[in-house]
A protein has these predicted regions:
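A structural boundary/capping signal
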Residues: 1-157
């Protein structure tokens, strides 16, 4: 198993356990995990991968049939695709057989469905106070949410 697959699987398991225990009730969007959590999840996964010296960028793509719907996943410097929330589309946009709960490797059907107007964006740094962007060098609302969620899942990693 690759380092990317090990870390992605470990994070997905931690998120599933925390969600199953109701620990995300007050942390939108994680209260609906994996639905609507792709971008925040990528921030956390990007942080964990960076801890292992694996640099990633987020790929943010629009749905080919409705550009108001978007999905986000990671791509490493070597071009490896990592997506641990594509199962949110199972039974709706994708057949169950086309979904991997932890995708590490090539693009799958989910990424192909969200291929319109793709944008590369950096991961949000939430774990380094030198990177806080709100007034008085405090974490911005997104960074605060990521800090809160990471504290919840850290015990399951």
């Amino acid at each position: 198993m690759t380092v990317e697959k090990r870390i992605a699987t470990k994070l997905r398991c931690a998120l599933d356990v925390a969600h199953g225990k109701g620990e995300f009730v007050k942390y939108w969007p994680f209260s609906r995990f994996p639905y609507d959590c792709c971008e925040h999840t990528c921030d956390i996964l990007g942080y964990l991968l960076l801890e292992e010296n694996i640099n990633t960028i987020q790929i943010n793509g629009a749905y080919i049939k409705d550009p108001t719907r978007r999905h986000v996943w990671l791509k490493t410097e070597k071009g490896v695709i990592i997506d641990i929330t594509e199962d949110q589309f199972a039974g709706e946009l994708l057949d169950e057989k086309d979904v991997e709960i932890v995708r590490v490797g090539m693009e799958g059907q989910a990424q192909k469905l969200f291929s319109k107007n793709r944008v590369e964006q950096p991961n949000t740094v939430f774990n380094d106070s030198r990177e806080y962007t709100d007034f008085g060098n405090c974490p911005n609302p997104r960074q605060k949410r990521l800090i809160e969620v990471f504290k919840v899942i850290e015990k399951y990693l």
